[in-house]
């Protein structure tokens, strides 16, 4: 089983850079500083809109062009012509996430707040005065991270797999007799939140509403704020219920923590946990299945065993990572990153997909399959995804794929992979809109979808 890199162990070793190209820190290593590259505002360059179809249709080419024109750090503009930086270099992302003092998660220091309207579509992703773990720094952040990790560590992986198998069978029973279905809409998008609802203590019937709210929120469009409100209200209600009647679930364990967190703080952290877990896990399932159904290296072994599932999942975290770009850090003072002058208060985004494609570490794409876990898909540094959360996501995704292949052994893509598949319109998350498949109709196993 492929396991995510242990954040408490030694740092992962990146693939060897190409010796024919200078490393990102070599420019200006001796002699005078050559100054920022042409894309920096110091040269009057304009920002690249973080939107458009190319983030869905050809992200590899897009990031290559951005790197060619601007280097490891590119100026971008967000909705409303709000300036920011996108870090595309592998080592620069590592540097950014390794210094929580210079590059802080305290969004209060942002120098653009006076330009942000209250109904800004990206508001749910860039919070101001939100008491969640995302924007907490220092010792308080470490205490909150410990609270979350301690609660998630109590999730029994054997029981988690059992719940995932049961819910997977129920969902597959809903379409297995039809001979064709959309794996995204009827399986991948429904399964993770069912499991999360179970381990967090939600009633099963609330899962569909959570799916809709999460999709609205993370796509960052006109319904983003409504999705955020629904999710926040759901978590506040859940915390109140568990405060009154504790159960055997993650929420009750968080409330039992002795570090003195308020119910509102716990509710805010639950929003972060569910939003960070559901959609990326659903996309991990969908993207891995797409790879297995379209790539001969994996398609040939669909019915021949499970050995390729872990390889496909690992490769997806390099090639089609569910989180493309992430709202990242704010510079606490003037500094330089990748040769660009970053002003105090500037917003700096983590270009996770761009860093994965960095030619300084990607001399041969085939070298990144197998057991290389040095990707940034789970983040890095103090604000990385907690290791227990990584394990939970992997158990859910791998079990979902294995159960589907067991139940539908001759599953095949029902459309042309070049023309029949489209990606969701989001520069943040990479996932398919649909994954139409066909298979030999099979009987139900007794589940109720």
Regions found by a protein language model. Give the residues of each.
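Cytochrome P450
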Residues: 2-449
């Amino acid at each position: 089983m492929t396991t995510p890199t242990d954040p408490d162990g030694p740092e992962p070793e990146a693939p060897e850079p190409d010796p024919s190209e200078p490393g990102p820190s070599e420019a200006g290593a001796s002699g005078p500083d050559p100054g920022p590259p042409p894309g920096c505002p110091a040269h009057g360059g304009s920002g690249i809109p973080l939107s458009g179809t190319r983030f869905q249709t050809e992200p590899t080419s897009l990031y290559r062009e951005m790197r060619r024109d601007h280097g490891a750090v590119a100026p971008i503009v967000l909705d409303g012509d709000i300036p920011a930086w996108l870090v595309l270099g592998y080592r620069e992302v590592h540097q950014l996430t390794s210094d929580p003092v210079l590059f802080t998660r305290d969004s209060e220091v942002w120098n653009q707040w006076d330009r942000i309207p209250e109904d800004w579509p990206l508001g749910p992703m860039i919070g101001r005065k939100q008491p969640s773990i995302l924007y907490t720094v220092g010792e308080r952040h470490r205490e909150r991270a410990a609270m979350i990790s301690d609660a998630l560590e109590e999730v029994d992986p054997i029981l988690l797999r059992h719940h995932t198998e049961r819910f997977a069978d129920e969902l597959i029973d809903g379409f297995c007799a039809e001979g064709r279905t959309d794996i995204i809409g009827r399986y991948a998008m429904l399964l993770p939140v069912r499991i999360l609802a179970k381990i967090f203590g939600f009633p099963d019937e609330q899962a569909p509403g959570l799916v809709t709210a999460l999709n609205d929120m993370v796509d960052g469009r006109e319904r983003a704020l409504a999705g955020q409100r629904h999710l926040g209200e759901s978590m506040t209600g859940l915390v109140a219920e568990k405060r009154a009647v504790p159960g055997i679930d993650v929420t009750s364990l968080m409330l039992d923590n002795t570090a003195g967190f308020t119910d509102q703080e716990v509710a805010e952290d639950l929003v972060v946990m569910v939003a960070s877990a559901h959609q990326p896990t659903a996309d991990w399932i969908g993207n891995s299945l797409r790879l297995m159904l379209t790539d001969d290296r994996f398609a040939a072994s669909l019915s021949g065993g499970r050995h390729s599932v872990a390889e496909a999942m690992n490769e997806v975290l390099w090639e089609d990572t569910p989180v493309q770009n992430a709202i990242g850090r704010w510079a606490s003072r003037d500094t330089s990153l990748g040769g660009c002058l970053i002003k105090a208060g500037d917003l700096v985004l983590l270009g996770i997909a761009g860093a994965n494609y960095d030619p300084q570490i990607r001399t041969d794409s085939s070298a990144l399959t197998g057991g290389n876990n040095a990707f940034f898909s789970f983040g890095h540094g103090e604000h990385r995804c907690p290791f227990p959360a990584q394990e939970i996501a992997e158990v859910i995704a791998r079990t979902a794929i294995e159960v589907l292949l067991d139940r539908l052994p001759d599953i095949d893509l029902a459309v042309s992979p070049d023309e029949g598949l489209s990606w969701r319109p989001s520069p943040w998350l990479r996932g398919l809109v649909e994954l139409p498949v066909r298979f030999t109709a099979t009987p139900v196993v007794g589940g109720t979808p």
